[in-house]
């Protein structure tokens, strides 16, 4: 999992979902797990 300042480019990838967990914003991607990230 990467920590990124901006998740805008990742959320446009096919299969990406933006999820909020415990006050943090995550992008999870079941199709392409390389694009997992947390905003920070």
Curated annotation (Swiss-Prot):
Molecular function terms, GO-annotated: structural constituent of ribosome
InterPro entries recorded: Ribosomal_bL36, Ribosomal_bL36_sp, Ribosomal_L36_bact
SUPFAM superfamilies (UniProt xref): Ribosomal protein L36 (SSF57840)
Keyword Ribonucleoprotein among UniProt keywords: yes
Record-level GO BP terms: translation
Pfam families referenced in this protein's UniProt entry, alphabetically: Ribosomal_L36
Keywords: Ribonucleoprotein, Ribosomal protein
Key word Ubl conjugation present: no
Cellular component terms (Gene Ontology): ribonucleoprotein complex; ribosome
Family label: Belongs to the bacterial ribosomal protein bL36 family.
The protein's name: Large ribosomal subunit protein bL36
Native source species: Corynebacterium diphtheriae (strain ATCC 700971 / NCTC 13129 / Biotype gravis)
